[in-house]
C-alpha cells in the first residue's frame, strides 16, 4: 500500500491501553466495577508513512515516545494560532492613534440618538400615517372620521426636538444664538419641514 498517511488504532501490549482493561472480569477484579470502566479510553494515533515504510510494525518505542512529546505541543501551538487568527479577523485591525490621524473614514460620525441622524422623527400622535381619528358628533350618533393630524399637519414626520433637524448630538451652541427663538417657534408651529 502506497499511502502518504493513515490512522491506526494502537491496542497492543506495548501501548498504554491494553485489551485487558476492556474486559469485565479485569474491571471487577480491580474493584472499580463501573467506575473503572468509565475511565477506559481508546487511543488513536495518526502516523505519516512514506512509500518505503513497512507499516506500524516497524515503529519503535523511541519514535513513539518522541511523537508523544512533540505532537501535543505542536497541536497546542496550532490551536493558539488558529484562535488568534480567528479573533483578529472577527474584530478587525485595531484603531490606534495613527489610524485616527491618517483618515477618519473608518470612524463613524456621532449622530443624534433620538432620530439616528436623520433630523426627523415619526409623529407620535398619528404614528407616521398623517391621519388622525377624530370624533364627529352629528345629531344622535357619534361617527369617527379620519382627518389631517393636528400635530404633524398630515406629513407623518416631525422635526427632531433634540437636534432641531441637524442630526448632530450636541447643538447647545445653536440654542444660544438670538435667532434660535424664531427657529423654535417655526418648528413648533409646523412651518419647518423635515429635510428642508
Swiss-Prot record:
Keywords: Chloroplast, Metal-binding, Plastid, Repeat, Thylakoid, Transit peptide, Zinc, Zinc-finger. GO terms for molecular function: protein-disulfide reductase [NAD(P)H] activity; zinc ion binding. GO terms for cellular component: chloroplast; chloroplast thylakoid lumen; thylakoid lumen. GO terms for biological process: photosystem I assembly. CXXCXGXG motif repeats lie at residues 112-119, 123-130, 149-156, 160-167. Its main location: plastid. InterPro entries: HSP_DnaJ_Cys-rich_dom_sf. Coiled coil: none annotated. A zinc finger (CR-type) spans 96-172. Disruption phenotype: Slight pale green leaf phenotype. Residues 1-36 form a transit peptide. It is found in: Plastid, Chloroplast thylakoid lumen. Nuclear genome-encoded factor required for the accumulation of photosystem I (PSI) during plant development. May form a complex with PSAG and mediate thiol transactions in the thylakoid lumen that are important for the assembly of PSI. Possesses protein-disulfide reductase activity in vitro. This is Protein PHOTOSYSTEM I ASSEMBLY 2, chloroplastic. The lineage of its organism: Eukaryota, Viridiplantae, Streptophyta, Embryophyta, Tracheophyta.
